[in-house]
């Protein structure tokens, strides 16, 4: 609502005297926005995932959002628990690097929660969300071509486990 002009000074004085701080939880109950985005990663040990977090966090802060980050360490149960927690905590969106969940599990945890999700680096087949993927095959072909152009003939590929989408 509106505040009468003659009351503004006394309100500001009371705010300063009481060192009042906005309660983000109370605000989110009224506005239905938490100004927080969940970031769910398999690990921070790999430089790629650390860079996903750091870049996302920077952009979120620039736009007035806070990040809530969880790592599930390739553990199916933790991935499921953290996804459920972040959605239940009322995040306004989710940046998610999936690894173990099926479409059915994902739908069960996110059903009736209108939370936008961006899957990064991998995707759960059958889940309708925005997706950011690397062109790994194209990049590998370019790298091998460059090595061949420079005279290399004995070229090996060291990849991750075939169960991880980006290693296929």
Placement of each model-derived feature along the sequence:
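Short acidic active-site motifs
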Residues: 25, 78-82, 104-106
